[in-house]
Amino acid sequence: MNSPGLNDSKRLLRAEVVRLIIDGQTELALKLLSDYYGISEPDLKVGTVKRHRRVLACYVQNEKRIYLSKGEYITNPFVILHEYYHHLRSSELGKKRQVEKRADLFASNFISEFVTQQQSNRGGNR
């Protein structure tokens, strides 16, 4: 199932990143993602962090590092991408992009509803 609104190059990027992670080339996948989003790559380390010992993985913002509780998670796309999202959100550029995108969507939804109501009112006056 294709995600609506995605162009072919973004679909290809997503598929390639998942393939790289499954193939054990997680560092390359993180580099590809970071290049795409224009942010630094996070470090990747197998180990645990105090207060987060029971989770599969966690992202530590001040270290810019993804910790995996077990080495086998390095080939798990869901775990890696979930933690990468935290890295993306914590980067200034990532935060700004997400906030701006959400703000644009918020405004667009209001304007779209206004336009729909205006068109409906004009249709009823005929």
Which residue ranges define each predicted feature?
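Short histidine-centered catalytic/ligand-binding loop motif
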Residues: 18, 91-92
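Auxiliary, metal-adjacent structural segments of Zn-dependent hydrolase domains
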Residues: 7-67, 71-73, 119-126
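N-terminal low-structure segments adjacent to metalloprotease catalytic domains
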Residues: 1-14, 88, 99, 108, ...
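Short amphipathic alpha-helical segments, especially helix-boundary/capping motifs
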Residues: 3-9, 58-59, 79-84
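Active-site His/Glu-centered metal-binding helix of metallohydrolases
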Residues: 80-89, 102
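Hydrophobic (often cysteine-bearing) scaffold residues that line and stabilize catalytic clefts
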Residues: 25, 77, 99, 103
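Post-HExxH zinc-binding segment in Zn-dependent metallohydrolases
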Residues: 97-126
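Short pre-active-site segment immediately N-terminal to the catalytic Zn-binding motif
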Residues: 64-80, 93-98
